[in-house]
C-alpha cells in the first residue's frame, strides 16, 4: 500500500497569483541596491496604481460581495485610471465583516494558511485570513532597510500576543525572514511567559531589540527592579519598537530614559498588517507604501481630505490574495503630509491622533487620550500608571506617584493645577498606590 504523502501547497517557485507580477519590480529594486523608501513619488504612485488595479481585478473575479459593491458603484470593469479615482471605490466598513469569516475571502478555504482575529472588545471579532504566500512571499517583497536597521547579529525579543491576533507572529516573521535576526518569542505575560522568565531570557541571550506595547515596556522595566535585573547592565537594548497601543511623546521619553535606548512607534492592525513606522527623526510615521495605500477622509461626509487635514484613516492593502482590505475604514484618526523628512525617505508621513471612539469631550473641546496623557506625564512626580474616569460630565484622574518626596495631597494639588492650566477645566484627582497592572491592552479610560 502506497504511503500517503503531504505536499506544501504554496512555494515561492510554484505559486501563481495576481501578485506574481510584482516580484520582478521588487527584485529589480533589490538588484539596484535601493528600496521603495526613497523612490521618486511618481514611481511609488505608478506601482500603487498597478497594485490597486491588480487587487480590484482579483476581488472582482474571486468575491461576490466585493464585486456587487463595485457594480453598485458603477464599475463595469475593475479598474481605475489614476489614484485620484480610488475615491470611486466603495469603502469597507468594520460592521460588514465583523463576525463573518467568508464575507471578503477571495480564495478557496482550503488555501488558507493562517487565521487571525481581533479581540472583539467592541463587538464580534473580525477574522483575517492569509494564504501562506501572503505571509512568506508577498508580504516580504518590499524592503524597508532605512526604517529597520536590524541584521543577523541582532536578537529581537517579541513581547506581543501570539494568541489570535497578528502582532506576535507578524513581527516574528518580519524580523526572521526579512532581516535574519534571532527571535525570542516572549509573548505578553501569558501562562507560559511570566515576566521574570521573559526578563531572564532577554538577559541570557542579550536581546538588542524589544518589540512590545507601551504599557508592557513600562511593566518590564518596573519588574526588572523587583527581580534584580539591571537595565543597562544585564539587559542592554539598542532599540524598542512600540505597537498595539498608542502613547504620548512624554510617555515615550520616560521609556527612553528608563531603558536607555531609542524608542520608536509602529502602526498596524490585525486587519491590515503593517501600515506605517517612525524613522529615526521621530517626526511622524512613514507609510509603508509597498504594502498599503493610505487615505484620509472626513468621517461624516466621507470625502477624501487633502494633506494636512485631520480625519479618519482609510487603508487599502496592496499585496494580499486571501483577504484584501480595500478602502478599509480603520476608525483611527490622523493626517498625512508629503515627506520632507531629514531622513530622506519619500514615503508619505502619517500623524496619528488616536481612535474616534476614544475621543474625550471636556468642556467645549475634544481631546485624544494621548494629549491628556502628554499633559499628565509632564509632571515628573506622576508614575506611568493612571486612569481617566468620566462620569456624566465629570473628569477624574487616578494617578500613582513616582519617586517623589511630595505627599499624596501635595501631588494631587499639583496635578489639579497643571491640568487646569492645560485644559481649562477643574478635575478631581485621587492618588493611588495600587493601580492594577495588565498583560492585555492597558485600560486608561474608564466610563
Regions found by a protein language model. Give the residues of each.
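Nucleotide 5′-phosphate-binding alpha/beta core
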Residues: 1-117, 123-137, 144, 204, ...
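Active-site phosphate/ATP/adenylate-binding loop shared across adenylate-forming ligases
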Residues: 2-34, 94-236, 246-254, 258
Amino acid at each position: 500500500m502506497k504511503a500517503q504523502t503531504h505536499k506544501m501547497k504554496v512555494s515561492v517557485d510554484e505559486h501563481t497569483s495576481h501578485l506574481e507580477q510584482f516580484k520582478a519590480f521588487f527584485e529589480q529594486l533589490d538588484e539596484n541596491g535601493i528600496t521603495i523608501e526613497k523612490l521618486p513619488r511618481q514611481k511609488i504612485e505608478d506601482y500603487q496604481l498597478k497594485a490597486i488595479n491588480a487587487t480590484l481585478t482579483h476581488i472582482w473575479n474571486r468575491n461576490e460581495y466585493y464585486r456587487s459593491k463595485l457594480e453598485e458603484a458603477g464599475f463595469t470593469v475593475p479598474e481605475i485610471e489614476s489614484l485620484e479615482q480610488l475615491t470611486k471605490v466603495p469603502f469597507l466598513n468594520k460592521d460588514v465583516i465583523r463576525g463573518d469569516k467568508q464575507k471578503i475571502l477571495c480564495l478557496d478555504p482550503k488555501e488558507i494558511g493562517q487565521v487571525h482575529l481581533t479581540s472583539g472588545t467592541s463587538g464580534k471579532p473580525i477574522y483575517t485570513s492569509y494564504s501562506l504566500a501572503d505571509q512568506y512571499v508577498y508580504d516580504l517583497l518590499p524592503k524597508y532597510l532605512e526604517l529597520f536597521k536590524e541584521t543577523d547579529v541582532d536578537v529581537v525579543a517579541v513581547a506581543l500576543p501570539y494568541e489570535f491576533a497578528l502582532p506576535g507572529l507578524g513581527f516574528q516573521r518580519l524580523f526572521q525572514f526579512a532581516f535574519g535576526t534571532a527571535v525570542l518569542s516572549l509573548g505578553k505575560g501569558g501562562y507560559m511567559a511570566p515576566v521574570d522568565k521573559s526578563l531572564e531570557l532577554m538577559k541570557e541571550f542579550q536581546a538588542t531589540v524589544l518589540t512590545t506595547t507601551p504599557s508592557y515596556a513600562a511593566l518590564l522595566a518596573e519588574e526588572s527592579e523587583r527581580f534584580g535585573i539591571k537595565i543597562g547592565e544585564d539587559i542592554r537594548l539598542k532599540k524598542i519598537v512600540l505597537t498595539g497601543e498608542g502613547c504620548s511623546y512624554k510617555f515615550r521619553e520616560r521609556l527612553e530614559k528608563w531603558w536607555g535606548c531609542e524608542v520608536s512607534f509602529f502602526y498596524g492592525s490585525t486587519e491590515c498588517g503593517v501600515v506605517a513606522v517612525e524613522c529615526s527623526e521621530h517626526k511622524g510615521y512613514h507609510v509603508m507604501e509597498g504594502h498599503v495605500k493610505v487615505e484620509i477622509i472626513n468621517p461624516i461626509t466621507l470625502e477624501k481630505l487633502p494633506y494636512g487635514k485631520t480625519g479618519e484613516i482609510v487603508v487599502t492593502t496592496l499585496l494580499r490574495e486571501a483577504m484584501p482590505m480595500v478602502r478599509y475604514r480603520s476608525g483611527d484618526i490622523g493626517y498625512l503630509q508629503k515627506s520632507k523628512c531629514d531622513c530622506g525617505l519619500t514615503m508619505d508621513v502619517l500623524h496619528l491622533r488616536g481612535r474616534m471612539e476614544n475621543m474625550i469631550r471636556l468642556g467645549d473641546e475634544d481631546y485624544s487620550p494621548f494629549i491628556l496623557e502628554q499633559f499628565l506625564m509632564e509632571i515628573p512626580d506622576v508614575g506611568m500608571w493612571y486612569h481617566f474616569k468620566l462620569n456624566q460630565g465629570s473628569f477624574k484622574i487616578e494617578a500613582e506617584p513616582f519617586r517623589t518626596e511630595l505627599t499624596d495631597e501635595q501631588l494631587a494639588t499639583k496635578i489639579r493645577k497643571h491640568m487646569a492650566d492645560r485644559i481649562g477645566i477643574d478635575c478631581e484627582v485621587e492618588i493611588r498606590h495600587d493601580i492594577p497592572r495588565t498583560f492585555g491592552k492597558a485600560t486608561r479610560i474608564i466610563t
